[in-house]
Structure formats: C-alpha cells, structure tokens
C-alpha cells in the first residue's frame, strides 16, 4: 500500500514543480524573455528599437507573492509568453537591489534608490515606453503606461496589446479597450 502512495506523492511533486518559475541568484523570478543588460535605459531603449520591440521594465522583489502569481499563472501561458518575446525588450529591476541603473535623464543610482526616485511602491510594477524618450525625464515620467500589481491573463494580455497598438495615443482608455476585448475573449 505504501508504494502506490509514495509513487503518487512523487508524481504530484513533479507535476507541481513543472509549474514553478525559475528563481535567479537574486531571489527574483526569471523568464526566458528577460534581458540581462547593463541597465542603462537609453542603451536598452536603443536596443529595443533596433529589434523592433518596445522597452518594458518590470520591477520585482524577492518573496513577492504577486510576482510569483504572474510568473507561474500568467507569463507561462504560451500566447502571452510568445507575445512578450515577440514584442517587448524586458529589463528586470530589483526593488531592493544594488545594481546600478542609469535613467533616461542620465542619473545613475542603485536599483533600490532608482525605484524610490520613480515612486514605485508595489511589485510587480511594469513600465512601458514609447520608441523615443526625452533625455531630461525619468523613466516614471517617460513611461506611456504603468501596470502596478498582478493581473489575470486577459487583463495582462490586453494591456500588452494596448501598448503595441499605441492605444494610449488614441484617446481610448485602457479600461474601455479592455472591456471590449474581454467581452470578445469571454465568448
């Protein structure tokens, strides 16, 4: 009797581990589409543009249950993962990290101080950027949209689409855009 129960327990542990997101040495969740850069935002924006992608910064912290939710329940969905990989140049910032970040305005600070400068209070927070950002503004000022917190697959996917479609330029709020898309997706 013990053998079938033990085998079942091992299979369940393997199945649960399949859905666990990778964790880096810094304690943050990692995704294959994240870029390891020098965190110079002007250079990152130029590289994103060269690849025909949009720059996206994701601020996270060690032990964040909402970051875990995004990395285990939302980002692994094939449609979302492919969309991010195809359309975004993603740079991860550690809310309490010490790696230097150079902002669009030229100021260089450790991640933890840059996050304070940007007044980002929650994780995950995702900042989205246009193809051009003035050199006299911070990332917080240059972002076309900010997504604070964890959201479900439909909201997240629709936000990514709204950014790529430049919905922020159309005058249609994200909420209205999302409501229309969500109605279609729910059919």
Predicted regions and their residues:
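Sec-dependent signal peptide recognition
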Residues: 2-9
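N-terminal "domain-start" segment that seeds a small globular fold
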Residues: 21-44
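Thiol-based oxidoreductase modules, predominantly thioredoxin-like and allied folds used
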Residues: 35-37, 77-109
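A short beta-strand-turn-helix
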Residues: 36-55, 84
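Short active-site neighborhood of thiol/selenol oxidoreductases, capturing the structured segment around
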Residues: 51-65, 90
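Detector for the c-type heme attachment site
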Residues: 68-72
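Non-catalytic, surface beta->alpha helical segment in thiol-disulfide oxidoreductase systems
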Residues: 116-171
